[in-house]
Amino acid sequence: MTNDANIRLECLKPAERWAQPSGEEVREVLRLAGLTGGKAAKVLGLGPKGDRTIRRWVGEDTPIPYAAWALLCDYAGLGLIWKEV
């Protein structure tokens, strides 16, 4: 886990080395970003029922795609995880 958030470091890697985050980690990134499910759906361009998609990611019914996760991490101030440091 990171020091400031309950997110495993392997979830903050470029796509080829990335580990799928848990629903709780998705929830934590949303919290850090200050986004509700509805707001997250809008910034990710998920469409009118996008908040339902967010709930599925948090509930672990559907895995979050890497691109969506990476953007949420950027909004949360966790950096550009798709770039090598």
UniProtKB/Swiss-Prot annotation:
Organism encoding this protein: Escherichia coli
Gene Ontology molecular function: any one: DNA binding
Keyword DNA-binding in record: yes
Keywords, ordered alphabetically: DNA-binding, Plasmid, Repressor, Transcription, Transcription regulation
Top-level taxonomic group: Bacteria
Ranges of the DNA-binding region feature: 28-47
The protein's role, per its UniProt record: Acts with KorA as corepressor in the control of the kilC and kilE operons.
Lineage of the species this protein comes from: Bacteria, Pseudomonadati, Pseudomonadota, Gammaproteobacteria, Enterobacterales
UniProt keyword annotation of Transcription regulation present: yes
Name of the molecule in the record: Transcriptional repressor protein KorC
